[in-house]
């Protein structure tokens, strides 16, 4: 009779514990997906600011067509690379990050250009956009760190699933 009770208790507990573990994995997967949306949102904000920044620089730095074209092209290429949040593979994330890095490089060249034009140094719109862009870059960094932490936690959970 004791063996039967033990078997009955195990028969009830094992599925219950398994469903709890499964639910935890689903919750963590959804958290990773949600955090990736935050990362993409931060990058989108940067894209929007860059468009405004390019328009501001166009007016003051008419001789910098090459730099402006590089930023515009990098921005266009970065918007072409998208990731389906339900398909976050390492290759997809690398391609997305490469496009974002190319945009960052082009943007840094644009920031160097502004030093050569006194009109831009005092242009209030440019200064505000530059400050917002710096804040957005910090936000991107924070959101990416959160994403990496959540992804690592999720990966640990699924690799140690009983």
Predicted regions and their residues:
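A helix-centric hydrophobic-segment signal that preferentially recognizes long
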Residues: 2-162
């Amino acid at each position: 009779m004791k063996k039967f009770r033990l078997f009955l208790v195990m028969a009830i507990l094992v599925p219950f514990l398994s469903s709890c573990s499964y639910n935890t994995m689903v919750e963590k997967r959804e958290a990773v997906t949600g955090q990736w949306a935050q990362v993409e949102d931060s990058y989108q904000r940067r894209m929007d600011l860059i468009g405004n920044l390019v328009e501001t620089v166009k007016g003051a730095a008419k001789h910098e067509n090459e730099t402006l074209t590089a930023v515009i092209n990098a921005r266009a290429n970065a918007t072409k690379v998208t990731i389906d949040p339900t398909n976050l593979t390492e290759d997809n994330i690398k391609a997305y990050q490469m496009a974002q890095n190319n945009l960052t490089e082009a943007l840094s060249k644009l920031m160097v250009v502004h030093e050569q034009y006194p009109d831009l140094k005092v242009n209030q719109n440019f200064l505000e956009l530059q400050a917002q862009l710096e804040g957005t870059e910090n936000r991107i960094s924070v959101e990416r760190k959160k994403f990496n932490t959540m992804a690592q936690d999720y990966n640990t959970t699924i690799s140690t699933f009983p």
